[in-house]
C-alpha cells in the first residue's frame, strides 16, 4: 500500500510539472524548438527554402536588380545573345529577357500563391465546419466538391478561361474555383479524425461556441497538412499558368509572366537558335517549383506526428 502511494505521489508530481510547463508556455516552446530543429536538419527542405527565398526576393527587388523596363521594346537590340548589357539577352522586339524574368516572377508567383491561399481559405472554412458539424451542410458541400473534382482540372480551367475570358483576375478566380475541393476534403478529413478526441468532447460538454471549438481549438491541430497543401498547390498553379500562357490562353500577352516569356519560343527555329528566349525562364520555373516541393516535403515530414523523432 505504501509503495502504491509512493507511485501515485511521483505521478502527481510529474502531472503538476506538466501543468506548470503548459501554463508557463515552456512546453509549447519545447515543441516549437523540437520542430524547428527537425526542419533545420532536413537538408533538402533547407535547400528548397533557400531557392524559394532567393527567387522570391529577386522578383520583389526587380527594380534594384535591373534598369530595363520589361515591356519596353527596342528595335535596335532585337534578338541579342546574352552579354554584359543584357544578362539573358533580348527577345524578338528587343526587350531585356533578364528584366522580364524578374518582373514576370512577381506576377507568376502572385498567381500561384494567391490561388493557393484562396483555395485554402475556402477549403479550410468549409472543410472544418462541415467535418465538425456534419449533417445536410456537410453533404451539400461534399457533393459540390465531388462535381468539381470529377473533371480533370486543366480541362475545366480551359473551359472556364474560354467562357470568362483572359485576364489576371479571371485566371486566379478560375484556379480557386477548380482547386478548393482538394483542400476542403483534406481539412474535412483531419477534422473528422480530431472531433472524437476527448478534449473536443469536453469543450462541447462545457457548452463552448461551436465556431470557437472548430476554428480555435481543432484547426491548429490540423494545420500541418494544410500548409503542405498550400506549398504544393502554389507550385501546381505556377506550372498551370505557364502552360496556359504558353498556349496563349493564360494571362494577356502584354503582361510579363513566366508563361508569356515561354510563349515567345513556340517555333522550332527559336528553340534551336535563340535558346536564351526560353532556357533561362525554363530553368527559373523548374528551380522555383523544385524548391517549393522540397520545402513542402520538409514541412510535411516535420509536422507529421508519425515522423516525429
Name every feature range the model reports, one short phrase each.
Residues 123, 127, 207, 220-222, ...:
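Conserved G/P- and acidic residue-centered "switch" motifs that form tight phosphate/ATP-binding loops
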Residues 150-158, 243-274:
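Short juxtamembrane loops and helix-capping segments at transmembrane helix boundaries
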Residues 1-124, 136, 250, 254, ...:
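Gly/Trp-centered helix-boundary motif
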Residues 126-130, 160, 187, 200, ...:
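Hydrophobic alpha-helical interface/terminus motif in multipass membrane transporters
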Residues 87, 91, 121-123, 131-194, ...:
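Generic hydrophobic transmembrane alpha-helix motif, especially the helices
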Residues 50-54, 108-123, 150-158, 224-241, ...:
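Hydrophobic alpha-helical transmembrane segments in multi-pass membrane proteins
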Residues 95-110, 114, 134-142, 195-196, ...:
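Amphipathic cytosolic juxtamembrane alpha-helices at the membrane-cytosol interface
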Residues 62-69, 131-135, 161-166, 178, ...:
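Short helix-capping/hinge motifs at transmembrane helix termini and TM-loop junctions
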Amino acid at each position: 500500500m505504501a509503495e502504491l502511494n509512493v507511485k501515485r505521489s511521483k505521478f502527481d508530481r510529474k502531472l503538476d510539472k506538466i501543468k506548470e510547463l503548459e501554463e508557463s508556455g515552456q512546453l509549447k516552446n519545447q515543441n516549437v524548438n523540437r520542430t524547428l530543429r527537425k526542419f533545420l536538419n532536413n537538408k533538402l527542405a533547407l535547400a528548397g527554402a533557400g531557392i524559394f527565398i532567393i527567387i522570391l526576393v529577386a522578383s520583389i527587388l526587380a527594380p534594384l536588380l535591373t534598369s530595363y523596363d520589361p515591356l519596353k521594346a527596342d528595335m535596335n537590340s532585337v534578338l541579342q545573345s546574352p552579354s554584359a548589357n543584357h544578362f539573358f539577352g533580348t527577345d524578338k522586339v528587343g526587350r531585356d529577357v533578364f528584366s522580364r524574368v524578374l518582373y514576370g516572377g512577381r506576377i507568376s508567383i502572385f498567381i500561384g500563391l494567391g490561388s493557393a491561399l484562396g483555395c485554402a481559405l475556402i477549403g479550410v472554412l468549409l472543410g472544418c465546419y462541415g467535418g465538425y458539424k456534419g449533417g445536410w451542410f456537410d453533404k451539400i458541400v461534399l457533393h459540390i466538391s465531388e462535381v468539381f473534382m470529377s473533371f480533370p482540372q486543366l480541362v475545366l480551367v480551359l473551359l472556364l478561361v474560354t467562357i470568362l475570358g483572359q485576364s489576371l483576375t479571371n485566371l486566379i478566380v478560375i484556379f480557386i474555383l477548380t482547386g478548393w475541393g482538394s483542400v476542403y476534403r483534406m481539412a474535412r478529413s483531419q477534422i473528422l479524425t480530431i472531433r472524437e478526441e476527448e478534449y473536443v468532447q469536453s469543450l462541447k460538454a462545457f457548452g463552448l461556441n461551436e465556431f470557437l471549438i472548430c476554428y480555435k481549438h481543432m484547426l491548429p491541430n490540423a494545420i500541418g497538412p494544410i500548409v503542405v497543401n498550400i506549398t504544393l498547390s502554389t507550385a501546381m498553379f505556377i506550372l498551370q499558368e505557364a502552360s496556359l500562357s504558353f498556349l496563349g490562353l493564360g494571362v494577356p500577352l502584354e503582361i510579363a509572366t513566366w508563361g508569356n516569356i515561354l510563349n515567345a519560343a513556340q517555333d522550332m527555329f527559336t528553340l534551336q537558335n535563340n535558346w536564351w528566349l526560353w532556357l533561362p525562364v525554363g530553368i527559373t520555373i523548374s528551380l522555383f517549383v523544385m524548391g517549393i516541393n522540397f520545402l513542402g516535403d520538409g514541412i510535411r515530414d516535420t509536422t507529421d506526428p508519425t515522423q516525429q523523432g
